[in-house]
């Protein structure tokens, strides 16, 4: 069972955190992570893109000029794809991009993402994050104390409105919590700052 250094908001070590090896110490599956991320991004799409084909564009029923004798290229319609105002070749139509991924692959992808972040030293563990009043400065100073300058995702054990409101104005910083955090978020951000309770919950849920 891997041990991680536990820090406080001042960036000082306050102890060690025992992590579940089945969640934070596996060989990452790139194919599982890829499958889940592609599915997640596809599910975010509205799928409302639409354009008219040559058959659907209004007009263009008459031949613009005779077939031979003009010296110009032969044309049958002013709504052919090469014409301005013409139809679109293989025009996109509204459709659903949703794909489903089975539970086993989703769980493997989450364990893989957590293990990859830990193996690459891109994960920090805090004993707790406390914000008494909504203040961006509190989170900004915490990041400074932790020497985090890259994009960072803060993972809490449960939804905390004060932490979210305090962090939302800092560019490149996201906030999530157990039950909402996903593989795409973990891979999108360079650093993951996770509180102790969240790590323990994830260790139980995905074991």
Annotate each predicted stretch with a short phrase.
Residues 4, 8, 18, 40, ...:
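Exposed boundary/loop context
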Residues 32-68:
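A short, flexible low-complexity segment enriched in Lys/Arg and Gly/Pro that occurs
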Residues 54-90:
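Glycine/serine-rich anion-binding loops at beta->alpha junctions
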Residues 44-49, 67, 75, 82, ...:
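Residue-identity detector for glutamine
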Residues 1-46, 91-207:
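Extended polybasic, low-complexity segments that bind anionic RNA or targeting/receptor surfaces
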């Amino acid at each position: 069972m891997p041990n991680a250094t536990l820090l406080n908001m001042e960036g000082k070590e306050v102890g060690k955190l025992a992590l579940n090896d089945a969640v934070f110490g596996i060989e990452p599956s790139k194919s599982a992570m890829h499958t889940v991320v592609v599915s997640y991004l596809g599910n975010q799409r509205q799928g409302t893109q639409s354009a008219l084909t040559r058959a659907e564009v209004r007009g263009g029923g008459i031949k613009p000029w005779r077939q031979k004798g003009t010296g110009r290229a032969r044309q049958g319609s002013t709504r052919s794809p090469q014409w301005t105002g013409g139809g679109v070749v293989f025009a996109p139509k509204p459709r659903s991009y949703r794909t489903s991924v089975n539970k086993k692959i989703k769980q493997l992808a989450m364990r893989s993402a957590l293990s990859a972040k830990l193996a690459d030293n891109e994960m920090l563990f805090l004993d707790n994050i406390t914000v008494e009043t909504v203040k961006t400065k509190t989170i900004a100073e915490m990041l400074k104390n932790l020497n985090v300058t890259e994009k960072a995702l803060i993972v809490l054990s449960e939804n905390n409105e004060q932490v979210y409101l305090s962090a939302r104005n800092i560019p490149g910083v996201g906030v999530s919590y157990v039950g909402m955090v996903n593989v795409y978020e973990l891979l999108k951000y360079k650093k993951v700052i996770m509180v102790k309770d969240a790590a323990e919950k994830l260790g139980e849920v995905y074991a």
